[in-house]
């Protein structure tokens, strides 16, 4: 890029030195602003909503024409003396041997050699320039964005043969940074063009890049841009009152920003943020600057400091939390550009650039553990952004080399020991699973590792029936894996995937719902990791606003308005990000007619339990009689492969059991599920028994699942052979005994009263 810009400058100097005249080209009056070369705006692809046109400039260059080939033949060599003993020798004969004539002509045109000096000095008068020269640094330069390999840690090459030599699974080693960087920025495009909405201040630049675009709901605004090794830029486009407004924000290495045309200088004209290594600049017109200043009033220096003084992963997590706020407050999809959304998109793009800069400045090798953490968070950020900006497009930031490295690491991971890992080591493993997620050969081990982590989280959860912050973070990582895996697998064809959904559903109960809605209701906990709920991975389909409000109001000191705010926020998040869909299940093919009636699905190895509001013809149906008045509820056992049930179909009564004997050394209830439902609100929760510890905790006195004081809650036990029983515990026995004793006492009192009356009457 620098060589190209230098050649353009030389062309201009050559014209000036020999007094020649270049080829004529009219000044562009309609800036070309397509999303990517040759593409138009479509849903899910880059582009712009309308044909962009700008007001023609009043100053136009004088058209001149000359044969540049003839000029080169007359002056085959040119010496340019820039002073300070700096000279450049330009041999045109050698140049035309390497560069096609058409390209030389294009460079000649972009050098604007036909312009008069007066026109050159005046053509940028409408381009916005700062009033004062930027003098003081914005913050200070830090290297927190760089993933350096620690002393003593090994380095590996990433060729197909050598990648297998990797022995570590924890990412504490280095791999070649230039190779990874080439993968992440693999596309080649015209990143900058004179006709772009950058007001003709740049030369054409073709470079390796990643590209993105986001639209707003009003279809009149769009933001799009590129990420390269040297810089990244975002152009905001707004259609207002029949005119397009443009604002380009660029961030990059100070000494590697694209060369400006003419007499424009970054430091005196455009810089809004700078430290010892990076700079942020804005490019627009005076009129457009006034428009965007009133519309979004951006804090460029604050954005610059955040991006350059904090680790990229920290900034990315903050952006993820902002997405939660937009979802919970019903602002998704984003309808229009505002200060919040404008700054979000800038940070979104420049966070990707800082990840690139971390690779660029890491030297020869980059630390895998740190790199995977950043790329994992960026992947999640892109997925969340896609739910809030419609349409959203992103191309780039994939790497086959990284996938190969991650696959070897997954192979080396001692999955059976994952339950003994610290939270930090689990974080690293889950990030590795995400990077290896697109490798088909690694699928089985990825799901196995995820299931082991889920099982351990669930087991620990039953000790206190409370999810720790670290555990919610790990559930989030598994959730990200499921967003991809659900497209490739069906639950009952993979035991580990089934365990993941069963344990997630078991942690989605009334306590969990009220906890999350309570945090969202105070509007101060828009944290993705604090508010992430296993309900987003459950196979429950009974979530409604009214149900969530009902669960939330059970909390003390919870007003109806707060409960409604929290429940609405949780409902919006569930609607946007709930990964479990009915079509995911193989059994869905024979239950399509009942899709609207299904409340919950409980998959087991050979059969599937379906909780619904209607009986299912091909299964064994258990009519739940003690249910709420508004709707009926059935628990149906259906063969997972949609075959005929061995014992035939039909409706059966649910037998009642008062006492369950549990072995102290074995786990007779393992593989069974317990279902709780309320007479008024219906389905409450489900718990699946995975091991003895879970079995013991479910029946402990501290368990909130069996509420001995609530006479309106009922419990069913679902066996893996299709049998369903109702459990009536001690509270039912105590109720019956209480009623009998009460009747006996009342009878005695009535008898005594009657005897007293007879005695008085007789006497």
Curated annotation (Swiss-Prot):
Segments of this protein annotated with the region Interaction with gL: 219-283
Intervals, Virion surface compartment: 23-739
Signal peptide start-end: 1-22
Sugar-bearing residue positions: 67, 84, 91, 112, 136, 148, 157, 241, 557, 606, 641, 659, 721
Modification after translation, per record: N-glycosylated, O-glycosylated, and sialylated.
GO biological process, one term: fusion of virus membrane with host plasma membrane
Protein's membrane topology: Single-pass type I membrane protein
Subunit relationships: Interacts with glycoprotein L (gL); this interaction is necessary for the correct processing and cell surface expression of gH. The heterodimer gH/gL seems to interact with gB trimers during fusion.
Entry-linked HAMAP family: HSV_GH (MF_04033)
Role summary: The heterodimer glycoprotein H-glycoprotein L is required for the fusion of viral and plasma membranes leading to virus entry into the host cell. Following initial binding to host receptor, membrane fusion is mediated by the fusion machinery composed of gB and the heterodimer gH/gL. May also be involved in the fusion between the virion envelope and the outer nuclear membrane during virion morphogenesis.
Listed name of the protein: Envelope glycoprotein H
Native organism: Equine herpesvirus 2 (strain 86/87) (EHV-2)
Taxonomic lineage: Viruses, Duplodnaviria, Heunggongvirae, Peploviricota, Herviviricetes
